[in-house]
Amino acid sequence: KKSFLYKVEDFFTKKELIEQKKNIDLSRYNIPNGVNIEKPVFLNKNGLAFLPKRILLKIKGKIIVDGGAYFGDSALVFLEYTPSRVYSFEPVNLTYKKLKETIRINKMGDIVTPIKLGLGKKAGKAFIKGTNSAASLTTSDFKNAQEISITSIDDFFSGKNDVIGLIKLDVEGEELGVIKGALETIKRDKPILLISVYHRPEDFFFIKPLIDDLNLGYKFMIRKTSSFRVTSETVLIGYSG
């Protein structure tokens, strides 16, 4: 009698099963206590590990926008690509404190700037629930929610001479709005894009066409950056050139 039950291993490729057994050396980083370590950040560099070297060189000497900075794990990795500065946006009170601690204990203050703002389509206010890597905006359940201020990427960098080399977004379902608020920056600088598209189904279908409509010659790939999860940590990677 045929069984229709699946093993967990059936949902992963052979390569992913091998990666699951790998030990990630974090000894060169100082990690604050009380945070969840997201292995894909260090293993696949938020998706940068899938890009050719000639594309990665475009980050050197330019600005990185880290949307959804969490405790600064992405910033630790991004420094390997020698940006001029990393702006780490993290609006959650407790997480922002961890971000500042990471910057301090790793002596990254000359390169990494913590920004206690959320990112969105336009400036405004919102309420957010949660204190870890899965905090999310709420429009109805305000109990125990934190009010946060929001800016757009276009507004934040308006009037500045900064050239953006990379935009990374993992903002718990607000990615589409953030991209809509960054279109002028994308048109101007054509940065590498690392956009999480697994929080909301519509993001998987709408974000790429929105960027395609700009006619900037972007190439795209979709990669699952985590070898440990079936669907989460799916990232739309875009680059020009």
What are the functions of these language-model segments?
Residues K1-G241:
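Phosphate/nucleotide-binding beta-alpha loop and adjacent structural elements of enzyme active sites
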